[in-house]
Amino acid sequence: MKINTLQSLINQQITQVGHGGQAGRLTETNPLTENSHQISTAEKAFASEVLEHVKNTALSRHDIACLLPRVSNLELKQGKAGEVIVTGLRTEQLSLSDAKLLLEAAMRQDTAADG
């Protein structure tokens, strides 16, 4: 899935739910009607798809500050210049707001590399 398509899906789900705290999904299931407390296959697929785009992305200070309450969900490393880099996920879920922020960071990095 292209990064722009994934970003559109995230924005659509945030609009549908009304906030970004909900775990993202790759299917058309309505997060408001699901009652399961288990991590669904769609949530795992969503997190995996986002990770594919954001792995090895350097985060800004603002990104880190926004992710701080949930930073334990991410695998991070320090780059050679002291930057914080996303290397993986420690959970099989990712909130819509975190996914949106991480994809925006990946887009910034891609734009800077192309510039």
Swiss-Prot record:
For this UniProt entry, the molecular function terms from Gene Ontology, in alphabetical order, are:
protein tyrosine phosphatase activity
InterPro entries in UniProt: ProtTyrPase_YopH_N, ProtTyrPase_YopH_N_sf
Q: Which domain of life is it from?
A: Bacteria
Induction comment from the UniProt entry of this chain: At 37 degrees Celsius in the absence of calcium.
UniProt lists compositionally biased (Polar residues) regions at: 27-39
Segments carrying the region annotation (Disordered) are 19-39
Q: Which Pfam families match?
A: YopH_N (PF09013)
Sorted keywords for this record are: Plasmid, Virulence
Its function, per the record, reads: Belongs to an operon involved in the translocation of Yop proteins across the bacterial membranes or in the specific control of this function.
Q: What is this protein called?
A: Yop proteins translocation protein M
